[in-house]
């Protein structure tokens, strides 16, 4: 029996090591061309390897788990959507690869979206290498299922838009480490917050407020039989924090800042419209939210991830679709929002008028 397995496992192991080394070297070469030479300290964690050891931590862990140096295959994932989607895809890949004893590689496009903001560690699988691999596509729902613990196949590429704590919350410390902000991103956000004043005093409690507008204003009612957050929801959420904490300051970010200025009452002097709302450059807004103590979110993965990284108390918009919404076929609220978060039901009356 043992001799029959050798032709299969050894070429696979060699191929996986080749893929890892090739991807890492290619990635390093691209960085050297684009950037000034960096010290070892500044290099991404995935490219810091000694000349005598080409094994990644993931490779060593996989070998230890399965014995005899046998590598069982590799996982990757589609890179689609904006920042919140990309973070959900990354975290899901990270968790499922660990769960199934596989190596995890991310597409270059995902690295380009996340690496400028976070200290991510998964190695990059460049397109030239990916084209040579016989991938098996594997669709993921937006919540964890038991079958995902035993995913068949050696070369699996996940599809879908997974962004649920049910995939990765058991690895929360590691996920938080993966999404640690680069120093300059964090320091810029903290400097802004340190400069804020509420009625002349420096606040001790910061509440990040993310208001998703943009395409959702039309997509939610016209496609998903749902609503976005209205003025009433935001007033209730702000008042809940005012009642709970002494003199909090609300740091508002949105891709609809004009609407926010018209609909969020700032007359008390405790609301700051801080975000730039530039969807193509989300780092500033996201960093501000994560450096706050608590979160008010509306809908969308951007707000979910900001709340997840910030910790503290979170208030979210709940029940924002009709019961027969097709959205509920692809989205489970209980898998999106942590149990300890507090939901305020949305006002669905605008939908009932039509």
From Swiss-Prot:
Give the enzyme's main class according to its UniProt record, as a single word: transferase
Q: In which tissues is it expressed?
A: Specifically expressed in gut.
Q: Which GO terms describe its molecular function?
A: alpha-(1,2)-fucosyltransferase activity; fucosyltransferase activity; galactoside 2-alpha-L-fucosyltransferase activity
Residues annotated as glycosylated: 199
Q: Which GO terms describe its cellular component?
A: Golgi cisterna membrane
Renumbered to this chain, the Basic and acidic residues biased-composition regions fall at: 57-68
What is the similarity comment for this entry? Belongs to the glycosyltransferase 11 family.
What does the UniProt record say this protein does? Catalyzes the transfer of L-fucose, from a guanosine diphosphate-beta-L-fucose, to the terminal galactose on both O- and N-linked glycans chains of cell surface glycoproteins and glycolipids and the resulting epitope regulates several processes such as cell-cell interaction including host-microbe interaction, cell surface expression and cell proliferation. Preferentially fucosylates gangliosides GA1 and GM1 in the antrum, cecum and colon and in the female reproductive organs.
Fetch the PANTHER family from UniProt. Answer: GALACTOSIDE 2-L-FUCOSYLTRANSFERASE, GALACTOSIDE ALPHA-(1,2)-FUCOSYLTRANSFERASE 2
Q: What is this protein called?
A: Galactoside alpha-(1,2)-fucosyltransferase 2
UniProt organism field:
Rattus norvegicus
Q: Which gene encodes it?
A: Fut2
